[in-house]
Amino acid sequence: MKKEKRQRLIKQFVKEYEIEKQERLVELLAKKDVLVTQATVSRDIRELNLTKVPSQEGLMIYKIFSEEHLQTDIKLKKKLREVVVKIDCVEQLMVIKTLPGNAHVIGVLFDELDWKEKIGCICGNDTCLIISQSKSDREILEERLNLII
C-alpha cells in the first residue's frame, strides 16, 4: 500500500479512536490488510505531526497537531497584542495584566496551545497567572511572549 493511503488511514484512526500506543495503530492497519512494522508507524507519526495529549480520562493519546493548534497560536498572538497591559514574572510564575474582561480569553488560548512549559493558568477579570514547573520553563514562556508582543 502506498504511503499516502496508509497515512490517511492513520489519521482516520486517530480521529475515530483514542490511540495510546503505536502498536494499536499497527493492529488497526492490519485489520485493513495493511501490514507494517512499528518503526514504519513511528515514522508516519512524525511525518503527520501527531502528538500525545491527555484525553478526558487522563490517558495520553495521539492527536493531529495541525490547523487547530496553528489557529490557536495565531489567535493568541493577535489577542496578546490587543489586550496585554503588562507582564511581570517571578520564579516560576508569570502574571499577565490585561484590559478588563480579557484575562480569561488569554488563559483559554494558553490552555489550547498545551505548551509543555506551562502547568496551569488561573485567570480573573484582568489578570492571568501562568504557572510553570520551574523558573527556566517560565523564562522560555516569557521569551515566546516577548517575540509575539
UniProtKB/Swiss-Prot annotation:
An annotated GO BP: regulation of arginine biosynthetic process
Family statement drawn from the similarity comment of this UniProt entry: Belongs to the ArgR family.
Signal peptide: none
GO molecular function: arginine binding; DNA binding; DNA-binding transcription factor activity
InterPro entries: Arg_repress, Arg_repress_C, Arg_repress_C_sf, Arg_repress_DNA-bd, WH-like_DNA-bd_sf, WH_DNA-bd_sf
Main localization, broad class: cytoplasm
Domain of life: Bacteria
Tagged with keyword Heme: no
Protein's recorded name: Arginine regulator
SUPFAM superfamilies according to UniProt: C-terminal domain of arginine repressor, Winged helix' DNA-binding domain
Keywords of the record: Arginine metabolism, Cytoplasm, DNA-binding, Transcription, Transcription regulation
Annotated pathway: Amino-acid degradation; L-arginine degradation via ADI pathway
Gene3D superfamilies: 3.30.1360.40, Winged helix-like DNA-binding domain superfamily/Winged helix DNA-binding domain
Gene Ontology cellular component annotations, sorted alphabetically: cytoplasm
Location(s) in or outside the cell: Cytoplasm
Summary of the function given for this chain in its UniProt record: Regulates the transcription of the arc operon, involved in arginine catabolism.
Underlying gene: argR1
Record organism: Bacillus thuringiensis subsp. konkukian (strain 97-27)
